[in-house]
């Protein structure tokens, strides 16, 4: 929570200088809370229950020249509306792309570079060459503009071409348990000489998201663990939050959080790996169990965030007539009226 690097582990593959903790990899869906949802909640583009259709963003030409829907989801599209929170919980790729488009691709690229320090040089070149304005809406056929699926995939789906390291992902996720603030990682707390403190790290804390946004994202990521793709990270008595991620190149991730600690797990899939051993969320669970954190420690809800009951049909505050409802977290003033669709 304070930027202190407690431990790291990597297979050296027989080379003492080999360290997967500092080796870039494709982040997959672990990028979504940073490059899409956190930003969109911060500026009000979306809220917890913003509705998006569970359908493809567009059409691309496959390797065989046959058109296919893009992006692909793990499960088939339903064509029904889903909330932003449920889309993140289920790691819905199409909704992540749509939210990114609503927020702004170029703004997200700037954030990843300027605020998180990620290498997005290739993504900036794509934007310069293709232009962000070449959107699906300009193409009557429904096909994506040339290069559009590439830039959207890189940013929304975690395929930054120069990758991101495990240490940078752990560093970035601390904002979701630290009121939106980031403290640079350090492995040494202090150096003593002759019984006196000789050196301490000069860590400058910076605000990445507002406290309200950080808390709402924290609760969204809690849903991932309680009822989503990260269910195997659950630890009895602990408030575990986190996000799973995979890539088509064999990258497997889980970045998990409990009050005071972040654990980022990455591995490259091996056909000989046992499925249970290779579960990144399960590995994170084992770490949190060994930490033995205080189960009574809880996240405090900011004064600017309200827990509300919403209507799953409209995404608005639920009225007495609403039959299907859920509980979400919202910035104060998000809603000005109750659901009228269920009357």
Annotate each PLM feature.
Residues 1-6, 116-117:
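Short, glycine-anchored, charge-dense loop/turn motifs used at functional sites
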Residues 5-23, 27, 33, 163-171, ...:
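A penicillin-recognizing enzyme superfamily signal
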Residues 5-6, 27-41, 48, 95-96, ...:
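Extended, hydrophobic alpha-helical segments in both membrane/secreted and soluble proteins
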Residues 17-22, 79-81, 89-96, 128-158, ...:
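Flexible glycine/proline-enriched surface loops and loop-helix/loop-strand junctions
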Residues 43-47, 103, 107, 112-120, ...:
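A generic secondary-structure signal for well-formed alpha-helical elements
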Residues 46-108, 136-137, 152-155, 194-223:
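Conserved catalytic neighborhood of penicillin-recognizing serine enzymes
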Residues 49-50, 120-134, 138, 147-150, ...:
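Surface-exposed patches in mature extracellular/periplasmic domains of secreted proteins
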Residues 65-74, 104-171:
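Mid-domain, small-residue-enriched loop/turn segments at the edges of structured enzyme/sensor domains
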């Amino acid at each position: 929570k304070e930027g202190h690097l407690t431990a790291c582990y990597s297979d050296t593959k027989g080379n003492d200088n080999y360290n997967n903790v500092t080796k870039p990899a494709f982040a997959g869906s672990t990028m979504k809370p940073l490059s899409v949802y956190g930003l969109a909640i911060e500026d009000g583009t979306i809220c917890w229950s913003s509705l998006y259709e569970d359908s493809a963003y567009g059409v691309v030409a496959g390797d065989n020249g046959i058109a296919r829907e893009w992006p692909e989801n793990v499960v088939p599209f339903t064509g029904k509306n889903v909330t932003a929170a449920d889309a993140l919980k289920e790691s819905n790729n199409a909704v992540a792309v749509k939210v990114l488009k609503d927020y702004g691709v170029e703004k997200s690229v700037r954030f990843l570079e300027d605020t998180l320090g990620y290498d997005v040089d290739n993504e900036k070149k794509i934007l310069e060459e293709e232009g962000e304005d070449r959107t699906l809406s300009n193409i009557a056929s429904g096909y994506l503009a040339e290069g559009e699926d590439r830039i959207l995939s890189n940013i929304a789906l975690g395929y930054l071409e120069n990758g991101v390291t495990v240490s940078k992902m752990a560093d970035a996720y601390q904002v979701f348990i630290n009121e939106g603030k980031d403290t640079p990682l350090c492995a040494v707390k202090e150096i003593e000489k002759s019984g006196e403190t000789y050196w301490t790290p000069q860590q400058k804390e910076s605000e990445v998201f507002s406290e309200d946004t950080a808390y709402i994202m924290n609760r969204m990521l809690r849903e991932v663990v309680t009822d989503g793709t990260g269910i195997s990270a659950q630890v009895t008595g602990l408030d575990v939050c986190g996000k799973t991620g995979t890539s088509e190149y064999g990258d497997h991730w889980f970045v998990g959080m409990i009050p005071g600690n972040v654990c980022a797990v990455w591995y490259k899939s091996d056909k000989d790996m046992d499925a249970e051993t290779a579960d990144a969320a399960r590995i994170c669970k084992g770490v949190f169990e060994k930490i033995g954190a205080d189960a009574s420690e809880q996240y405090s809800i900011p004064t600017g965030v309200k827990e509300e009951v919403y209507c799953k049909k409209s995404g608005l505050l639920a009225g007495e007539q609403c039959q299907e409802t859920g509980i979400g977290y919202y910035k104060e003033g998000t809603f000005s009226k109750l659901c009228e669709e269920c009357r």
